């Protein structure tokens, strides 16, 4: 367990260091934004898999309260990400976007995010061809 905590702390530290490097040109800014969006897609997929595991009886028994915290953070992450995408897409403020996301169910939010990132992945794949 100690090794897991140390490894998680190191990963978080390296991620923070990588995110803190300033981009110097427009090309580098575009690359950084693309990397962040791809990382967000990977986060969304990982958290979706994580949310699916919450239904397993043995998982709930094994992790207990820690699992509830992780699941709660995943839901908050999904809501924030959906609000950010809506604000950017529709050109509205963050608060207005959050007001649009609030009445949505957890399933609707996940479907919205998967559609959004699915379209982006398809566009990037078609550009490479």
UniProtKB/Swiss-Prot annotation:
UniProt note on tissues of expression: Expressed by the venom gland.
Residue ranges listed under propeptide: 21-60
Keywords: Antibiotic, Antimicrobial, Cytolysis, Hemolysis, Secreted, Signal, Toxin
KW Thylakoid (keyword) present: no
One GO location term (cellular component): extracellular region
Keyword Ribosomal protein: no
Predominant place of localization: secreted
Signal peptide: 1-20
Compartment(s) where it occurs, according to its Swiss-Prot or TrEMBL record: Secreted
Molecular function via GO: toxin activity
One BP annotation, GO: defense response to bacterium
Domain of life, per lineage: Eukaryota
Known function: Insecticidal, cytolytic and antimicrobial peptide. Forms voltage-dependent, ion-permeable channels in membranes. At high concentration causes cell membrane lysis.
Entry's family note: Belongs to the cationic peptide 06 (cytoinsectotoxin) family.
Protein name: M-zodatoxin-Lt8l
Organism per entry: Lachesana tarabaevi
């Amino acid at each position: 367990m100690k090794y897991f905590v140390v490894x998680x702390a190191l990963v978080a530290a390296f991620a923070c260091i990588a995110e803190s490097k300033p981009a110097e040109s427009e090309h580098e800014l575009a690359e950084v934004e693309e990397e962040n969006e791809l990382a967000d897609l990977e986060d969304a997929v990982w958290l979706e898999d994580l949310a699916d595991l919450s239904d397993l009886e043995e998982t709930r028994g094994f992790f207990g309260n820690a699992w509830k915290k992780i699941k709660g953070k995943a839901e908050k992450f999904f809501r924030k990400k959906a609000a950010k995408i809506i604000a950017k897409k529709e050109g509205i403020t963050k608060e207005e976007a959050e007001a649009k996301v609030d009445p949505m169910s957890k399933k609707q939010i996940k479907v919205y995010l998967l559609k959004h990132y699915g379209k982006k992945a398809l566009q990037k794949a078609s550009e490479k061809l």
